Amino acid sequence: MASRRRSRELALQFLFSYDLNAAGAGDFDAWMEDFCARFNLSEKNFPHFFTLAQGVKNRWEKLNDLLAESSEHWKLSRMSGVDRNVMRIAIFEMLYCDDVPPRVAINEAIEIGKKYGTDESGAFINGVLDRINKELGGSEADLPENMNTTNSKE
């Protein structure tokens, strides 16, 4: 598995757990230390994992605002925790990781959402992130070339 994909999956697991259990109430650094010890992150995966986890946490409200504005008829609380956190990671990468093209962030989010989310996650994540990409000034060229958002859970 590619190092960046694994880092994103670990960030999803961390943020999902943090979101459900400690967001706003717990010590982020202690939560991070416990997670890293429990999952024994490799030196290869840690840098991008940490960038994503810390970056999403530091921009939590901004990312939530973008999600809320771009997901018509869906409150954040109604979204699956997996979908919500996959999209936070992708939006963070689209905004703050210059080395990650928007189409890569979107495609990775779709694939990870299909793997860990529901049958509808890929299509839902694609729709919301496509809207956000357009709002941020992205174009069709920024979207994944082959968006296979069928309802399969690879």
Swiss-Prot record:
Domain of life, source organism: Bacteria
Gene: nusB
Source taxonomy: Bacteria, Pseudomonadati, Thermodesulfobacteriota, Desulfobacteria, Desulfobacterales
Keywords, sorted A to Z: RNA-binding, Transcription, Transcription antitermination, Transcription regulation
GO molecular function: RNA binding
The keyword RNA-binding appears for this protein: yes
PANTHER family in the cross-refs: ANTITERMINATION NUSB DOMAIN-CONTAINING PROTEIN (PTHR11078:SF3), N UTILIZATION SUBSTANCE PROTEIN B-RELATED (PTHR11078)
Name of the molecule in the record: Transcription antitermination protein NusB
One of the GO biological process terms: transcription antitermination
Family matches, as NCBIfam families: nusB
A Pfam family that the UniProt record links to this protein: NusB
Function (record text): Involved in transcription antitermination. Required for transcription of ribosomal RNA (rRNA) genes. Binds specifically to the boxA antiterminator sequence of the ribosomal RNA (rrn) operons.
Family named by the database record: Belongs to the NusB family.
GO CC annotation terms, alphabetical: cytosol
